[in-house]
């Protein structure tokens, strides 16, 4: 049987998660919540001590809206094909809401080198740096991943300062952060930070609980390069803008990956978003939302595969087989056509001509040189800065 975390609390959480896998749209829209809760409790109460799937499986923890999905069939097509051809199966769970809350769930297991409940996870690289520096991740064997070695974009090999050569992290997607607005309410769109302060939006604006995305976008809107040489003064100015907007009631929502629910229901009319999520919402619901990477600059990050120390050697090799599968350009193109984020796989743009010709020149997936000029990375923080800035951010958000 598959292993569960040694920590009893984490083990119970994992058992409940695996016992109640819902359609992703239900999760994001908050549908059937009552039934889900009842089902979760019922299944958890009768779960066996070992729980989970069989021994011939691995568990991949990811974000929502982050893998191609067939609504009618209720499957992830690329993953379904992989499971059919591999001699093991991948249990795919959309458990990452934001980096800090997910890290809090697995922190104890990581520190003890115990199984976390996941054989591979795809957190953001700034968080992966924390795990790398703590010695909590296993080094990849590129002999098992020829596609990665051949097809990872050249710029990505050295993109993470704490992991030159990508020994411990392999990019999954490069998410971009911008903002969105209800097109019916604001047909002219929103293009500056001041636009978000429109009195018509009072109580209807939301921001993301990821500090680097929210503060990065504010810094950029205030004329500061988030990747540049800024410090406490610039951070404090950005925080002052955010605190004023929250205290006045203009911003009324701070969420992680479940923020899309409030956009879909109309509870929120505008806010900071992960670009691809809104592209998918418009695909599902009709073009109800305008979305843009602001002219002054939006944010870009990297979510990367990692393998925690508690994963067995056998399952680490299986994870490497899975990653290598997704580094085939045609598979990467199929995923990118759905998630609408920048793909790190060379050749995916050429492969997209066969997968979905309408997406070949989609700048959300394949940014041009001009597009890259409008994307900003958040600079690497020292541990002391990270702690101090994160504490200040959490305080203002009331988290």
Describe the function of each predicted region.
Residues 1-22, 35-41:
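N-terminal secretory signal peptides
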Residues 127-129, 206-210, 214, 218, ...:
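Ligand-binding pocket segment of bilobal, Venus flytrap-like solute-binding proteins
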Residues 13, 368-399:
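Conserved C-terminal helix/tail region of periplasmic/extracytoplasmic solute-binding proteins
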Residues 20-29, 37-54:
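N-terminal twin-arginine translocation
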Residues 114-123, 138-178, 204:
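A structural signal for short loop-to-beta-strand junctions that line the ligand-binding cleft
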Residues 308-373:
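Mature extracytoplasmic/periplasmic domains
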Residues 178-185, 220-223, 301-316, 334-338:
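A bilobed periplasmic-binding-protein/Venus flytrap-type ligand-binding module shared by bacterial periplasmic
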Residues 54-125:
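Early extracytoplasmic/lumenal segment of secretory-pathway proteins
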């Amino acid at each position: 049987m598959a292993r569960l975390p040694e920590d009893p609390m984490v083990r119970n959480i994992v058992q409940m998660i695996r016992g109640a896998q819902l359609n992703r749209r239900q999760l994001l829209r908050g549908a059937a919540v009552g039934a889900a809760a009842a089902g979760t409790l019922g299944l958890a109460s009768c779960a066996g001590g070992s729980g989970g799937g069989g021994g011939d499986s691995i568990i991949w923890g990811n974000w929502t809206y982050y893998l191609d999905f067939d609504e009618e069939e209720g499957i992830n097509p690329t993953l379904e094909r992989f499971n059919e051809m591999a001699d093991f199966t991948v249990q795919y769970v959309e458990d990452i809401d934001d980096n800090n809350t997910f890290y809090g769930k697995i922190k104890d297991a990581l520190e003890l080198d115990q199984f976390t409940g996941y054989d591979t996870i795809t957190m953001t690289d700034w968080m992966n740096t924390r795990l790398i520096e703590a010695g909590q991740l296993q080094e990849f064997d590129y002999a098992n991943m020829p596609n990665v070695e051949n097809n990872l974009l050249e710029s990505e090999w050295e993109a993470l300062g704490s992991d030159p050569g990508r020994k411990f992290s392999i990019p999954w997607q490069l998410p971009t952060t911008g903002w969105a607005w209800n097109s019916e309410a604001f047909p002219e769109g929103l293009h500056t930070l001041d636009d978000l302060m429109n009195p018509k939006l009072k109580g209807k604006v939301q921001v993301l609980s990821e500090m680097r995305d929210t503060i990065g976008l504010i810094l950029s809107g205030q004329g500061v390069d988030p990747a540049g040489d800024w410090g406490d003064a610039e951070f404090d100015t950005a925080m002052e803008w955010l605190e004023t907007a929250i205290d006045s009631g203009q911003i009324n929502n701070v969420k992680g990956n479940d923020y899309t629910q409030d956009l879909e229901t109309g509870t929120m009319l505008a806010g900071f978003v992960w670009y691809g999520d809104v592209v998918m919402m418009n695909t599902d619901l009709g073009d109800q939302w305008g979305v843009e990477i602001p002219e002054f600059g939006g944010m870009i990050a990297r979510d990367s595969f990692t393998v925690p120390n508690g994963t067995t050697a056998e399952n680490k090799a299986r994870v490497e087989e899975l990653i290598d599968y997704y580094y085939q350009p045609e598979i990467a193109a199929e995923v990118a056509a759905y998630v609408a984020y920048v793909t790190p796989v060379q050749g995916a743009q050429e492969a997209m001509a066969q997968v979905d010709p309408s997406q070949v020149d989609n700048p959300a997936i394949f940014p041009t040189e001009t597009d890259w000029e409008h994307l900003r990375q958040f600079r690497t923080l020292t541990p002391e800065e990270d702690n101090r800035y994160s504490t200040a951010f959490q305080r203002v958000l009331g988290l």
